[in-house]
Amino acid sequence: ILESTMYQGENYTTSFDELLIKKSQEKGIELHELESVDFQLDLLNNLYTWDDVKATISTVADSTKKEETIKYLKDTFNAYVNGNIEFLEEDVANMKKEVPEFYDALVTQRNIKMAENIDNLVEDGKNHTIAVGCKHFIGEDSILKELEKRGYTINRL
């Protein structure tokens, strides 16, 4: 929600998720969620207190921090678009080192579950397109590594 609010301040009116959903609906492509909104909200509710939320909102309201956050989000987006995997790997590694309990809940455990959901999804033998945040594809605890553990061969295009 906070990211969306910041992007709106930068005149971005549609999130990438919204764009993918709209394009899929226009083309009649069936959508399946790897995580429900309720799951994500429950996860955040279990990780953050109301004081954490207020502190984050206060930080975002601070114009300097807001600009830093927007720059970080743009840098992340540009790294993804330009294939700068090193930037993304460093960011993921920093999170794992600096806040391991959050990393485990927000990255590792979710990636294990999403890989399981992908494995179940592809059992029908049909082609599927999977969309998740780019950092879920990065690092030693990534969805890709989890799929490799399940016997899949991963090729970067």
Predicted region positions:
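Structured, acidic catalytic/metal-binding patches in enzyme active sites
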Residues: 1-102, 106
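A cross-kingdom marker for long, charged
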Residues: 101-157
